[in-house]
Regions:
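Catalytic machinery of carbohydrate-active enzymes
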Residues: 1-283
Length: 283
């Protein structure tokens, strides 16, 4: 780390260091900076508040500051104020040009409703049960003039999504097709609504201006990680006293049944999706 610091200092001659990670390695880099008179700003991750929010007993269920705000404060403390001028990954454009996703499908036609579904996440505590999600897919697929795009990665996920695509009309799996991240993100910018877990797909869809119906289990929006400009009405979750049990969803369910997810009805998800769909053709 000392060698890394020396190389960075020699190459860039920086006069400020912003630590947006606040772990042992970045703490050491910050120490080296301070020893050389370089101004340091460290993000406040709010660890104490997160512990109070996720502990099993005497839980303090209050919304914490968003991670975006914590980033802004870290820049501000070092003299680099961040203005709130972000309009999405595609700038002032509502979406990416149609040719950007041409490798995946034809351009969207008038009256067609496009729905994206990203049903997986890194940890079990953040994944809506597959059997229940299939009911969501089947119900949405029965809506006229609707196409559903399934997003996922990995062999096991691809098998599940390919199975759904075979069983339901107008459902297409993109898992394992290797269209590339830019093309898939461009497609997401054109869909009417994305169904996602508390995962990267939730954030990516939000960043391209697509409404997201997010499903929350072991984690909670109060931890500060909800999607950019996401409506609370589109966050599907149950008011359980044990929620949230962790910030990132990695802890096993102490109940053993993940009722926080299995207790969510497929229809409650469908209802939130439908209100984002445009009118059907001829209506």
């Amino acid at each position: 780390l000392w060698q890394l610091f020396a190389e960075l200092r020699e190459k860039f001659a920086f006069d400020g260091f912003i630590d947006l990670h606040d772990v042992l390695r970045t703490k050491l880099l910050g120490l080296f900076c301070r020893l050389h008179g370089i101004k340091v700003s460290v993000i406040n991750k709010g660890r104490r508040g997160k512990r109070a929010l996720t502990r099993r007993h005497s839980k303090v269920l209050l919304p914490l500051q968003s991670t975006r705000a914590r980033y802004r404060q870290a820049f501000h403390r070092i003299g680099l104020p961040v203005t709130n001028c972000f309009h999405g990954l595609y700038g002032d454009s509502a979406a990416a040009p149609a040719e950007a996703y041409a490798a995946i499908c034809r351009p969207k036609s008038g009256g067609t409703r496009w729905i994206g579904i990203a049903p997986f996440a890194k940890h079990e505590g953040k994944i809506y049960p597959v059997d229940l999600m299939e009911k969501v897919v089947g119900t949405l697929a029965a809506i006229p003039d609707t196409e559903i795009f399934l997003f996922g990665g990995g062999e096991k996920e691809a098998q599940v999504l390919d199975g759904w695509a075979k069983r339901y009309r107008g459902v297409r799996s993109l898992a394992g097709k290797r269209y590339g991240f830019p093309a898939e993100l461009a497609l997401v910018s054109h869909i009417d609504v994305m169904v996602s877990m508390d995962s990267a797909n939730m954030h990516l869809a939000s960043l391209v201006g697509t409404p997201v119906v997010s499903i929350w289990g072991a984690t909670h929006p109060y931890c500060g990680f909800k999607g950019w400009r996401q409506s609370e009405d589109d966050m599907v979750q149950l008011p359980m006293t044990c929620r949230p049990c962790s910030v990132f969803g990695q802890k096993p369910c102490f109940r053993g049944d993940y009722l926080c997810l299995r207790g969510i009805s497929p229809q409650s998800i469908v209802d939130r999706v439908v209100r984002h769909l445009p009118p059907a053709r001829g209506s």
